[in-house]
From Swiss-Prot:
It comes from the Bacteria. CDD domains: RecA (cd00983). Can catalyze the hydrolysis of ATP in the presence of single-stranded DNA, the ATP-dependent uptake of single-stranded DNA by duplex DNA, and the ATP-dependent hybridization of homologous single-stranded DNAs. It interacts with LexA causing its activation and leading to its autocatalytic cleavage. ATP binds at residues 67-74. Its main location: cytoplasm. It is found in: Cytoplasm. GO terms for biological process: DNA recombination; DNA repair; SOS response. This is Protein RecA. It comes from Proteus vulgaris. One of its GO terms (molecular function) is damaged DNA binding.
Length: 325
């Protein structure tokens, strides 16, 4: 519907006043927004990148990754850092849990010499560091490990047993309001790792909840629920874990999709295992019983042998080009 001439003049004057007061680009028509094409960073998992819809985690947004202990939360974020560094991006790791293992990070492909790392004393300090790094415009990816370890200053200075009801939630709520806009302006990806707690007295429904209040749930553009679903064994020795990630919230594509992959201890996400599974799904690799074949040639009996074949052959490059990746 056409707008009459007087309204168009009034609108143009208002837009001009807003841009004069708040700067160019402070208001625009949605179709003119250059940020409509979302830039992403790979998670290090092909199947998870596909499940996310946009091809990875969106830049300029807040992402929450949560799950039980030893489910692969930190491993997944380290894989994101490795992928970002390969693209020449600058990354920072806020280690509130004081538990980051540089040797393990290096095994996953992280360039530890160029990874910024901070071990803050309080939750407020951690979030202020996040804000300072974001406002610098020079850091592309920031990881906070974890929300549960962001302890308010008042709680640290108090005594054990003192009540500090809602302190962490208020701290996170204030931080989210401050960080969200700065992250968008700087095009910085901020990933929070979070832990799971159980609600007391829940008779029906899911008793699980995450720490830090509700603010992070609202401000996060993507929320990933990561779970360990089984063990990978080499004989009697456990060498890794079967992992399932559910996209429980997604503001940049369709939510509620799932990805399954293997995490191998000391190696990270088993990319070759994903290539085998996705190759079978897209009918690039044939599976008959325990045997896997490519173009009529057998490449291995069992998934482990097929993975070894991919590691040793250039077939990996060809398989990466299947439709959907």
């Amino acid at each position: 519907m056409a707008i009459d001439e007087n309204k168009q003049k009034a609108l143009a004057a208002a837009l001009g006043q807003i841009e004069k007061q708040f700067g160019k680009g402070s208001i625009m028509r949605l179709g003119e927004d250059r940020s409509m094409d979302v830039e992403t960073i790979s998670t290090g998992s092909l199947s998870l990148d596909i499940a996310l819809g946009a091809g990875g985690l969106p830049m300029g947004r807040i992402v929450e990754i949560y799950g039980p202990e030893s489910s692969g939360k930190t491993t997944l974020t380290l894989q994101v850092i490795a992928a970002a560094q390969r693209e020449g991006k600058t990354c920072a790791f806020i280690d509130a849990e004081h538990a980051l293992d540089p040797i393990y990070a290096k095994k996953l492909g992280v360039d530890i010499d160029n990874l910024l790392c901070s071990q803050p004393d309080t939750g407020e300090q951690a979030l202020e560091i996040c804000d300072a790094l974001t406002r610098s415009g020079a850091v592309d990816v920031i990881i906070v490990d974890s929300v549960a370890a962001l302890t308010p200053k008042a709680e640290i200075e108090g005594e054990i047993g003192d009540s500090h009801m809602g302190l962490a939630a208020r701290m996170m709520s204030q931080a989210m309001r401050k960080l969200a806009g700065n992250l968008k302006q700087a095009n910085t990806l901020l990933i929070f790792i979070n832990q799971i707690r159980m609600k007391i007295g829940v008779m029906f429904g899911n008793p699980e909840t995450t720490t830090g209040g509700n603010a992070l749930k609202f401000y996060a553009s993507v929320r990933l629920d990561i779970r360990r679903t089984g063990a990978i064994k080499d004989g009697e020795e456990v060498v890794g874990s079967e992992t399932r990630v559910k996209v429980v919230k997604n503001k940049v594509a369709a939510p509620f999709k799932q990805a399954e992959f293997q995490i191998l201890y000391g190696e990270g996400i088993n990319i070759h295992g994903e290539l085998v599974d996705l190759g079978v799904k897209h009918k690039l690799i044939e599976k008959a019983g325990a045997w896997y074949s490519y173009n009529g040639d057998k490449i291995g009996q069992g998934k482990a042998n097929a993975c070894n074949f991919l590691k040793e052959n250039s077939l990996v490059k060809e398989t990466k080009n299947f439709n959907g990746c």
